Every structure is written in structure tokens, then in C-alpha cells.
């Protein structure tokens, strides 16, 4: 049953006479308190905040003076008291509330400056279970929510970034309703995000990826100029997950990344991370979240050249992801072509100097590579809901490949198969990828018909061969990967016509036997992975 409101009109201006300050992040708190004190505002504080203000020589009362009760249980209980919450929640123009305050000696609190225990930080650093639990704030969120609910009379500030706007607002000693309402909205968003982080942490600890209530929280890193298109508004929210990538990378040069830059850079870096840096240098070039070319080689510069060769036309204005430190030789190759973003685990000083010749080129150092096997979640909004799933962390190296044809693949074909399947995992469905000797030969993406994807990939391979001055297409003697099963033999026959000699696919079609028979008829080796990689 809903609680009835007395509907007492909120005043516009509220004079600030008493302020409660209780913060974990003490950035700027002494300066703020000094400014409040200069305005004759009474300061009340708790624990470490009280000590910081007292040490700064400021006149500050301990919260126990409001409660008549000492801080107990290692600080777990200090503000959970009617003396505090009555002062925050009282409707000042309600006679009954005013009488209750008078009867119980409750002081009205006009301003609350509160931030929370660093749960997100402790969780991100991998704190042990008891330490992480101990950093779940109880009193802080309670005071924030109480203050925000009573924003008709109380101003709540939860972010040090709002200290300056607060001081501007109270230049005449009062806050206006519009300001208090805005701060209340920010406060509820803060506690919601805080609780979301706690809830999601417990879901991880208990291995419950799909709990009854799933809250997706994040902190606005930046408002973007626009979204996918200029008429769409956009913002970049970060979750606090420390997975190396575009959200955690350092921008070494270049202007702000756009919405599309971030989306494409994430896709590129997740793809190139499939290739272990200790095994071989690798490069992936991405446009519109699809790979144009991917390659490994003895050197990073050669890997870039081989990736570029697959589709140099589409690579123009693309995103380049590397699995090793960007060196000067590779940088010299990259600056020959217009590129939007480069992301690598690190960047050498010599490479920075080279890239600096292209000041608009965005250069990111991620500090490492994401582990493709790490569990996580992805989300997609739909009308009226959110689709949530675990990250596709399936790895072809972990699968038991099943040879289903008379001819088994050669050792080289098997390597090419695995390479192609890794790439196909990151191509929009329907996906077909030809690969040979650690290089994509042709990529067909996003077609409604799988056979059309095979044909497009073959056309790309022919165009690449012509550009390279080769007599035959790159698909000759290649392996071909399909991210989902081949429903008919036509897709296989198209790949065979392009020159593929080996096929890797999940299998599982009602017509598997028909497809296997076609492969045997053309002496093509085929393996089933048993794992699909749809990508939409």
C-alpha cells in the first residue's frame, strides 16, 4: 500500500545553518568545510572526517553530540540514530514534525556532504572476501537516501566535483529548490550504482550470472558529441571492471574517441587478444566492428602489412589493434594510411614520436591484453527489457575437434582452421573466413545467406590478390571457417570453388551428412568444433 503524502509545498530557498560532513574520499573536504565555516554554518562530522577537520583547526562537532551515543563496533554504528535521521527527514513546515524535533532535541540538518566507503575500488583490486564485505557502507547510503528524499529542505552532495557548484549556489547563504532537486537525483543515482556493484559482486562470488534482479551500473566517463549518428545523444559509462581495453586504456594522443570509435576499438582489441603475444605478433584491422584483415607474422610490422593486404580498401579509416607493444617500424607502416585509432598493450617512445606526426590519430595504451577466457557479461537493450548473456569466452584451443571426413587435415591446414575460426568468432553472422599461413585471405560478414558470405569473402580474396600482383586468389589452398553450422552443401561448394581445401564449422545441421559427403567428394578435410559463435 502506497504511503500518503501530506503535500506540504516545498520552499524555494532554504538557508544553510547546519551541515553534516561524512566522507571516505576526503578530496577537497577541508577547503569546503572552511568555506562553510566562514559563512557561519555549524559543522558536524564523523570519525575520520571529524579528525581531518579538527586537525585543520576548524570548529567541528562530533555526531555523537547529536545522538548522545558514542560510535561503536569499529565504526559500524555511528549515524544510524533518530538524532541524525530525524534531522535529515523532518518536514520543517509540518507542525507534527516540528513538535517531534523539539520534544526529542533533534537538530535540523540543512546540508549533507557524504560519500561512501570505496567498495568499488576494493572489489576492482581483488580484495579478499572479508575486506570487500567490510567496505560495504551502511550508514552513508542511509543518510544519502534520507537527505535526497527530503530535498525539499535538505541539500545532499555526494561528489567532490560538486563542491564548487555548491559554494556558488550558497553565495547568499541559501540553496534553491532546483539545485536541491538536481543534487537529490545525483545522490540516488550514486547509491543505485553503489548497490548495483555490490549486487553484481555477490552474483560473481556465488557464480549466479542470472540473478532474480540484475542491475547494470556505471559511472559516466564522458558525454559524447553524439552516438552512432549525429542526431543521437550518447555517453560512455564505465563499470569499474579492470579488463584491459578501451575503457581502461590511456589515451596517449588524439582527440576524444567517438561512440563508433569506442565500439570498434573494443571489437578490435578483443579479437587480437585471441592470439597470444608470446606465440607470435598479431594485428587486427576493424571497420564497423567487423575485421577487414587479421594476421600473425614473425614481426609486428609484417603482421600489420599482412592484415592490411587482405582488404586495404576497407582498412582506410579503420581501427588497428595489436597484441604486442607498438614499435617504431610498425608505426611507420601505419602512418602511411589514414587510421582512426590504434590500440596496443603498450607503445614504445620511438613509436610515440612517429605517431605524433599524425596528431589526429588516436593512440591508446591498454596496459595489457584482455584474457579471452575470462567470464563476464554482455547486455543489449530491447523494447521493454534487457538481454543479458555471459561473454562468449569459448576458445578453439579448448575444444575437442572432430574430424568428420575421410581425409584428415594436414598440420598446416589444422593451424589455418584454428586461425580462421578464431577470427570468425568476431565476425558478424553469417560469417565466413578464409585463412592461410596465419593470414585472413577473405572475410564475408553479416549476410542473411551463408553462401552469400562465402561468395563475398571469395571476391575480397580475388581483389586482394590482384592488388598484391598475385596470379591466383589468396583462397587457393586455404582453410575456411564458418561461425555456425553449414545448413546446406552450397556454402561448402562455394568455398571449394574458391580454392579452400579444409573446412572448420560447429556442425549440428540436419544435413550434416550431405555436407560431409560433398566434402569427401572433393577430397576436402572437415572438422566439427561443437561450438557456435553467432554474433549479432
UniProtKB/Swiss-Prot annotation:
Keywords assigned: Hydrolase, Multifunctional enzyme, Purine biosynthesis, Transferase
GO biological process, any: 'de novo' IMP biosynthetic process
Superkingdom of origin organism: Bacteria
Entry annotated with the keyword Transport: no
Membrane-spanning segments: none
InterPro entries to which the protein is assigned, alphabetical: AICAR_Tfase_dup_dom_sf (IPR024051), Cytidine_deaminase-like (IPR016193), MGS-like_dom (IPR011607), MGS-like_dom_sf (IPR036914), PurH-like (IPR002695)
Domain comment (free text): The IMP cyclohydrolase activity resides in the N-terminal region.
UniProt protein name: Bifunctional purine biosynthesis protein PurH
Native source organism of the sequence: Rhizobium meliloti (strain 1021) (Ensifer meliloti)
Gene for this chain: purH
Amino acid at each position: 500500500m502506497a504511503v500518503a503524502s501530506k503535500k506540504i509545498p516545498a520552499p524555494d530557498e532554504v538557508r544553510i545553518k547546519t551541515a553534516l560532513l561524512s566522507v571516505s574520499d576526503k578530496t577537497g573536504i577541508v577547503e569546503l568545510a572552511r568555506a562553510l565555516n566562514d559563512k557561519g554554518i555549524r559543522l558536524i562530522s564523523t570519525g575520520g572526517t571529524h579528525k581531518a577537520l579538527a586537525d585543520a583547526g576548524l570548529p567541528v562537532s562530533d555526531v555523537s553530540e547529536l545522538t548522545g551515543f558514542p560510535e561503536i563496533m569499529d565504526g559500524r554504528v555511528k549515524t544510524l540514530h533518530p538524532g541524525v535521521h530525524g534531522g535529515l527527514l523532518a518536514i520543517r513546515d509540518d507542525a507534527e514534525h516540528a513538535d517531534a524535533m523539539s520534544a526529542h532535541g533533534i537538530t535540523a540538518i540543512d546540508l549533507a556532504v557524504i560519500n561512501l566507503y570505496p567498495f568499488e575500488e576494493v572489489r576492482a583490486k581483488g580484495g579478499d572476501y572479508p575486506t570487500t564485505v567490510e567496505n560495504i557502507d551502511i550508514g552513508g547510503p542511509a543518510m544519502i537516501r534520507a537527505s535526497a528524499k527530503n530535498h525539499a529542505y535538505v541539500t545532499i552532495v555526494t561528489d567532490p566535483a560538486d563542491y564548487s557548484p555548491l559554494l556558488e549556489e550558497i553565495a547568499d547563504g541559501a540553496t534553491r529548490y532546483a539545485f536541491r532537486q538536481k543534487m537529490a537525483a545525483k545522490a540516488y543515482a550514486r547509491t543505485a550504482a553503489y548497490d548495483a556493484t555490490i549486487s553484481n559482486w555477490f552474483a560473481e562470488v556465488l557464480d549466479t550470472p542470472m540473478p532474480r534482479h540484475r542491475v547494470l551500473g556505471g559511472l559516466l566517463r564522458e558525454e559524447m558529441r553524439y552516438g552512432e549518428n549525429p542526431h543521437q545523444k550518447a555517453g560512455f559509462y564505465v563499470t569499474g571492471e579492470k579488463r584491459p581495453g578501451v575503457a581502461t586504456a590511456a589515451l596517449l594522443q588524439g582527440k576524444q574517441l567517438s561512440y563508433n570509435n569506442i565500439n570498434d576499438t573494443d571489437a578490435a582489441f578483443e579479437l587480437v587478444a585471441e592470439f597470444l603475444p608470446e606465440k607470435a605478433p598479431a594485428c587486427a584491422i576493424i571497420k564497423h566492428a567487423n575485421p577487414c584483415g587479421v594476421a600473425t607474422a614473425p614481426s609486428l610490422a609484417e603482421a600489420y602489412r599482412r592484415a592490411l593486404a587482405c582488404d586495404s580498401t576497407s582498412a582506410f579509416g579503420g581501427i588497428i589493434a595489436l597484441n604486442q607493444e607498438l614499435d617504431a617500424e610498425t608505426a611507420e607502416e601505419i602512418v602511411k594510411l589514414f587510421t582512426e585509432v590504434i590500440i596496443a598493450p603498450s607503445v614504445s617512445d620511438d613509436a610515440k614520436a612517429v605517431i605524433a606526426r599524425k596528431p589526429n590519430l588516436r593512440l591508446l595504451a591498454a596496459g595489457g591484453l584482455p584474457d579471452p577466457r575470462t567470464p563476464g557479461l554482455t547486455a543489449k537493450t530491447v523494447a521493454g527489457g534487457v538481454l543479458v548473456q555471459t561473454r562468449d569466452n569459448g576458445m578453439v584451443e579448448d575444444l575437442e575437434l572432430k574430424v568428420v571426413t575421410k581425409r584428415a587435415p594436414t598440420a598446416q591446414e589444422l593451424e589455418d582452421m584454428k586461425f580462421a575460426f578464431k577470427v570468425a568468432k568476431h565476425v558478424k553472422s553469417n560469417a565466413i573466413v578464409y585463412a592461410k599461413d596465419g593470414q585472413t585471405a577473405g572475410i564475408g560478414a553479416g549476410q542473411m545467406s551463408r553462401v552469400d558470405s562465402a561468395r563475398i569473402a571469395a571476391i575480397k580474396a580475388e581483389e586482394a590478390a590482384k592488388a598484391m600482383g598475385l596470379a591466383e586468389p589468396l583462397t587457393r589452398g586455404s582453410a575456411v571457417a564458418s561461425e555456425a553450422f553449414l545448413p546446406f552443401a552450397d556454402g561448402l561448394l562455394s568455398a571449394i570453388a574458391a580454392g579452400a581445401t579444409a573446412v572448420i564449422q560447429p556442425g549440428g545441421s540436419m544435413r550434416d551428412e550431405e555436407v560431409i559427403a560433398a566434402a569427401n567428394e572433393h577430397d576436402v578435410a572437415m572438422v566439427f568444433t561443437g561450438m557456435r559463435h553467432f554474433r549479432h
